[in-house]
From Swiss-Prot:
Subunit note: Component of the TRAMP complex composed of at least cid14, mtr4, and air1.
Comp. bias (Basic and acidic residues): 65-79
Region (Disordered): 19-86, 414-433
Name this protein carries in UniProt: ATP-dependent RNA helicase mtr4
Gene coding for it: mtr4
Sequence positions that bind ATP: 220-227
InterPro entries: DEAD/DEAH_box_helicase_dom, Helicase_ATP-bd, Helicase_C-like, MTR4-like_stalk, MTR4_beta-barrel, P-loop_NTPase, RNA-DNA_Helicase, SKI2-like
Source organism of this protein record: Schizosaccharomyces pombe (strain 972 / ATCC 24843)
Length: 1117
């Protein structure tokens, strides 16, 4: 059936695609190696992949040298065909990487599988580069009715709106590969799988790649239909009696995917660590961590795998777990082929190049910006009664509507937006000027959605507690009829009946059912897993009309809604409150619109602060996040690579995506360096020496003044002078706010969960009346984070506002105070104080007198007095410098600074270029190896010792620390209950505000030994030049749940342990399951050294925690 569809898909392009492509051999620089390093490599079938050099048909021109990015010379017609403006042509970097013909030996592979040795290419050797070919683009269209959206006006004047989208294809080809353009592909008859619907063009192209036994990356929006491609790969493998592995980033997604594939194909197994079902099945669903473990252990299963499907491959950029994807992809054999399913990523072709480089096989990229259900994006200004369409289904940004929304927001904020400064999100329960009580914003939005029949709706919030609070606000609404309520109760009771009677009485279970019966759900990581699954099932069945969820709901799970609402446009990322990125918005808003059910998806953003049009456009129409490597070394990785024959940690570093991406920067950096160097060399300044001396003097003075400012702004010295009406000079970074008037001073609140105190100069907030840019919006303090505000530009008249600044922003405290009225809410009162400030500045044209730090502020420390003397001396030197009164000083000095900036740029580029040419993270690898040698995990020749083999078994916790504790006899005298409690320190990562005040002695003792051992490891690490903060390392082992785990292991009920901590129930269960996984690894570690007593103790430890709701089975299984 695919033959006809492919003819339709490719027929238009037959005249465009084939042009002759010439290949050139390039010189490769091998970054660190001056001699040939021989490696024993495996996979005897790889030699069959060698083919003679042939001309490849392609739509690209000649490829240039390896030191320059490949260009496409003959793509005038097709230049726009590269997905998302990827650079024309593709360059596979050869720096420091072995161009081997075979895969390294993984695990204990039979001797007859070991092939001949191949050496890494040295400088001067030639390695043919991979090329990119078969680039084409197809435009498809979708028609939707031009009907009324959520506003009263039509989104389009047309009766029918035609929406166009592109399907783009490229392929990265290894050298000497006999490639046939995909337009000439003919599908087999019959195909491996047929569908009762017409395939979308991107699906047909992707399936054609699979039929050709060639890897493919499918990059498309959520709900576009990528699963169809994965299912075809499974069906083809089952037909050909070949093993296929389906990997996903999270266990919940693996469970759900297992259920779907089992229903579709039958011969399906599951391996997640927690559960193993039918491990001999032809199709195995597993987490990526399990696949990596199988590769390191040389599992027999891997010898039979023809296809590996990586779902949600964009998860590879995750800082913590993304490295697992890279390890796995590198370790997989070359004979396996891959299907990568991804959200839209702008550098998809770069990823395909990397796959071609490390596995010497073609990798196609099929990219589409197709949305089966187009989206309309609305803004809801806080406190208003209407929404504004700002981006229509054709992706047009409606500037006029955006400005209306901003005007409505400013009007509703009242005359004093800063009055809301410390109230955070309290306004969500208010509307109108002055904060008159009324229905909350979310209540109004949900009610409007229900009235207009735009449910089901997912309401995204970035806080678990806010999810629950907003859901409770909806409890007056009843969105289900009696039949639906009864059905919800039946499904819910059937699910929780597997729990014990005590567990069914947990508050979370009892309190959520009334909400579910009303059609209101909650979904976040703090929920009990069984409740999350029940809610997912109810939502899929249409029994929940409103779902309040955190961002994690947007990952993987295929549960679209008709409408998506964002309660905030800012999120806390662990450091600051920032705008949602374009990639995050795309991922979450992609849940709007159900294919086949809705002709449009609706997205509503609740906004509570002014947003500039560029910010809104970058969020609503921005590019998806790039797929950038998050590769980092770990001791477990290094030890496993040292243990396995034929590969090494250097092997991993040379082939990782991180190294590949950095190497691609070399040509750009070289070009930029050459340009900057030429610019610097041609930059001449007459009589430069005096300017250099003047600059040195001024820089030194500025440094001393900064030191003075740090002392003066210490709360102990300045707080008593910061009364209301005091004049202060404010400077934030390079932005000068000039003089302002102190309104009041308040203690800066710590963000929730942050235990580290601020620096003294950052621990207080000075609310100051200053002149700011005219377009400044509401100024709120969010969990201790100050709003972004700017002084008026030269052409801007500006306006007076009360702005929160840190003490560190004060650049001077004046002698003078002005009268301050009791109330500064109105703009008129602010203007009155502003006029008084202007009058003071007029009366002191030479400058307002500052408080003297020594005489007035009484700072008498000898070191400070010395510092002040240095400042005075340097100031007098600067004033007596011949250039000080030079009429052209400002112009000449600015010119000198430009030259200095150029010099810094050249130095910086040289450093970056040197770094890009070398093997990344090699210094860190060497320092980690020194640590392993000093602790006795490896020999001086990097041969793994017994300690190292034990540590190889432990991947769910700190392998070094646990191995040291095992060999130290730490667990010999502990009971199983104590073992469980102590090991919880290594798996609990969340923050808890309830710390153990008085820990039981039987727990405090082992904890102290663990911390002492951690300090020893930290000391050895620092001595080995490993960057490690000792206190941070020791504090990373959190004892917050030791008492909780100890009580559970002694038989306490789940309800009892929940009362002992503020940690969410779902987080507790997740911790217990990770703990069990770690203890199982401890059992394996004990087996390695033949310690049967430790093995038995760890098995007893599992027995005392493995019970009840903590380990209840998934509803998907």
């Amino acid at each position: 059936m695919f033959g006809g569809e492919l003819d339709d898909a490719f027929g238009v392009f037959e005249g465009k695609v084939p042009k002759s492509l010439k290949e050139e051999s390039k010189n490769s620089q091998n970054s660190q190696n001056s001699q040939k390093i021989k490696r024993t490599l495996t996979d005897k079938n790889a030699s069959n992949q060698e083919q003679g050099t042939k001309k490849l048909e392609s739509s690209v021109g000649e490829q240039e040298s390896a030191t320059k990015r490949a260009k496409i010379e003959n793509l005038k017609d097709n230049q726009d065909l590269i997905p998302n403006n990827d650079v024309n042509g593709i360059h596979i970097n050869n720096s420091a990487v072995a161009d081997t013909k075979h895969k390294p030996k993984i695990g204990d592979i039979a001797a007859d599988d070991i092939s001949n040795e191949v050496s890494i290419k040295n400088e001067g050797d030639t390695i043919p580069e991979a090329t990119v070919a078969d680039s084409f683009e197809q435009e498809a269209s979708l028609q939707v009715a031009g009907k009324v959206g959520m506003t009263e006006a039509k989104s389009s004047t047309e009766e029918v709106v035609e929406l166009r989208h592109q399907v783009r294809h490229q392929v990265s080809i290894p050298p000497n590969y006999d490639y046939v353009p995909i337009s000439k592909h003919k599908s087999p008859i019959p195909p491996a799988r047929t569908y009762p619907f017409t395939l979308d063009p991107f699906q047909a192209v992707s399936i054609a790649c699979i039929e050709r036994q060639e890897s493919v990356l499918v990059s498309a929006h959520t709900s576009a239909g990528k699963t169809v491609v994965a299912e075809y790969a499974v069906a083809q493998s089952l037909r050909d009696k070949q093993r296929v592995i389906y990997t996903s980033p999270i266990k919940a997604l693996s469970n759900q995917k297992y259920r779907e594939l089992l229903a579709e194909f039958g011969d399906v197994g599951l391996m997640t660590g927690d559960v193993t079902i039918n491990p001999d099945a032809t199709c195995l669903v597993m987490t990526t961590e399990i696949l990596r473990s199988m590769l390191y252990r040389g599992s027999e299963v891997m010898r039979e795998v023809a296809w590996v499907i990586f779902d949600e491959i964009h998860y590879m950029r995750d800082k913590e777990r993304g490295v697992v994807w890279e390890e796995t992809i590198i370790l997989l054999p070359d004979k396996s082929h891959f299907v990568f399913l991804s959200a839209t990523i702008p550098n998809a072709m770069q990823f395909a190049e990397w796959i071609t480089k490390i596995h010497r096989q073609p990798c196609h990229v099929v990219y589409t910006d197709f949305r089966p259900t187009p989206l309309q994006h609305y803004l809801f200004p806080s406190g208003s009664d209407g929404i504004h369409l700002v981006v229509d289904e054709k992706s047009n940004f409606r500037e006029e509507n955006f400005q209306r929304a901003m005007s409505a927001l400013m009007e509703k904020q009242g005359d004093d937006p800063a009055a809301m400064a410390t109230k955070g999100n309290a306004k969500k329960g208010k509307t109108g000027k002055g904060g008159v009580k009324g229905p909350s914003d979310i209540y109004k939005i949900v009610k409007m959605i229900m009235v207009k029949n735009y449910n089901p709706v997912i309401v995204f919030s970035f806080s678990k507690r806010e999810c629950e609070a907003l859901a409770l606000q909806m409890s007056k609404l009843d969105m289900n009829d009696q039949t639906e309520r009864d059905l919800v109760t039946t499904i819910f009771n059937n699910a929780v009946n597997q729990l014990s009677e005590k567990d069914r009485e947990l508050p979370q279970i009892e309190h959520i059912l009334p909400l579910l019966r009303r059609g209101i759900g909650i979904h976040h990581s703090g929920l009990l897993p069984i409740l999350k699954e029940v809610i997912e099932i109810l939502f899929q069945e249409g029994l929940l009309k409103v779902l309040f969820a955190t961002e994690t709901f947007s990952i993987g799970l295929n549960m679209p809604a008709k409408t998506v609402v964002f309660t905030n446009v800012r999120k806390f990322d662990g450091k600051t409150f920032r705008w949602i990125s374009g990639g995050e918005y795309i991922q979450m808003s992609g849940r709007a619109g159900r294919r086949g059910l809705d002709d449009r998806g609706i997205v509503i953003l609740m906004i509570d602060e002014k947003m500039d049009p560029p910010v809104a456009k970058s969020m609503l129409k921005g590019e998806a996040d790039r797929l950038d490597s998050a590769f980092h070394l770990s001791y477990n990785m290094i030890l496993n690579l040292l243990r396995v024959e034929g590969i090494s940690p250097e092997f991993m570093l040379e082939r990782c995506f991180f190294q590949f991406q950095n190497s691609l920067e070399v040509p750009k950096l070289e070009a930029k360096l050459e340009e900057s160097q030429q610019h610097y060399d041609s930059f001449t300044i007459l009589d430069e020496r005096p300017l250099e001396e003047y600059h040195t003097l001024k820089t030194q003075l500025e440094r001393y003044r900064t030191d003075v400012r740090t002392v003066v702004n210490h709360p102990n010295f300045c707080l008593s002078f910061l009364q209301g009406g005091r004049l202060v000079r404010v400077k934030v970074g390079n932005e000068d706010f000039d003089w302002g008037v102190v309104v009041n001073v308040s203690k800066r609140p710590l963000p929730k969960g942050q235990s580290n105190e601020y620096l003294p100069q950052e621990s207080y907030i000075v609310h100051t009346l200053v002149m700011v840019a005219s377009d400044t919006g509401p100024l709120r303090i969010r969990s201790g984070h100050l709003p972004e505000v700017h002084p008026p530009a030269a052409e801007d008249k500006g306006k007076f506002e009360v702005v929160p600044f840190l003490l560190s922003s004060l650049d001077g405290i004046a002698h003078i105070r002005v009268f301050l009225p009791n109330d500064l809410k109105s703009q008129g009162q602010k203007l009155t104080v502003g006029k008084a400030l202007s009058e003071v500045k007029r009366r002191f044209p030479e400058g307002i007198t500052l408080l003297d730090p020594v005489e007035n502020m009484n700072i008498k420390e000898p070191t400070f007095i010395k510092l002040m003397k240095k400042v005075n001396i340097l100031e007098s030197r600067l004033l007596s410098n011949p250039l000080h009164n030079f009429s052209e000083l400002e112009e000449k000095y600015a010119e000198y600074l430009r030259k200095l900036a150029l010099l810094e740029e050249v130095k910086d580029l040289k450093k970056k270029l040197s770094k890009a040419r070398s093997i990344m993270q090699l210094d860190e690898l060497n320092s980690r190896k020194r640590v392993l040698r000093r602790l006795g995990f490896t020999t001086s020749d990097d041969v793994i010792e017994v300690k190292g083999r034990v540590a190889c078994e432990i991947s769910s916790g700190d392998g070094l620390l646990l191995t040291e504790l095992i060999f130290n006899g730490m667990f010999n005298d502990l009971t199983p209950e104590q073992c469980a409690a102590l090991l919880s320190c290594l798996v609990f990562q969340e923050k808890s505000e309830v710390e153990n005040q008085r820990m039981k002695e039987e727990l405090a003792g082992p904890l102290k030994i663990l911390q002492e051992m951690a300090r020893r490891i930290a000391k050895v690490s620092k001595e080995s030049k490993q960057e490690l903060n000792e206190e941070e390392y020791v504090n990373s082992f959190k004892p917050s749940l030791m008492e909780v785990v100890y009580a559970w292991a002694h038989g306490a009920s789940f309800a009892q342990i929940c009362k002992m901590t503020d940690v969410y129930e779902g987080s507790l269960i997740r911790m217990f399951r990770r703990l069990e996984e770690l203890i199982r690894q401890m059992v394996d570690a004990a087996k390695v050294i033949g310690n049967t007593s430790l093995q038995q103790k760890m098995e007893d430890t599992i027995a005392c925690i493995h019970r009840d709701i903590v380990f209840s089975a998934s509803l998907y299984l």
